Amino acid sequence: DHASFVATCAAITDYMEDRPLGSKLLQIYDRQFALISATVMTYNIVGHQREPDYLQYLVEELADSKFPHDIPNTFEFAQIQVEKLSQMIAKVKKGMKTMTNLGHMEILDSGASGAVNFVMGLSGKDVGVAYKERIDHGIYAVSVRGSKNCKVHLGKIVNLLATSLGGSGGGHDKACGAVVPKPKIKKFITELNKKIK
């Protein structure tokens, strides 16, 4: 029974609450309750993504039919993550660049996925791209998001483009990612801009 709640949170987090199954799941729960629960869980997962023991603990708590507000310190940790994101807004405003069809920015001090929605929203474009160099691997980790007005399947485009440049990638129509060799990042962004008319 609790699995439907976890699935509802996942649908919200993965931008799928408007899809038939996601929409049906969301009708089961109070919308605001589901939204805040999904948000708190997302911030806890993303903020602890390099801590497998904590992630396992979250899974066990959810499997025991606990809601995020029942799990100690989840709201407090989410508040810390929100503060970090609010600081990101000023950095994006200062460092973001725009092209005809997208906004993009290299991220230096946090993860790309945390900034990409701000890049999209603040650029006024239907697509946002944030990328962070992984110096030890000679690649860029790229995060791509599309607005509801984005008319192309970004996951398919990113998959083909990243692969053609010696990397890999893909994902959903409005949310995806890629790994791109460092020397090819500018070409990746330029070509992506051309393909999302």
PLM features per residue range, with description:
Residues 1-104, 108, 120-127, 131-134:
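A structured phosphate/pyrophosphate-recognition subdomain
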Residues 21, 103-197:
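Glycine-rich, acidic loop segments that terminate in or are immediately followed by a histidine
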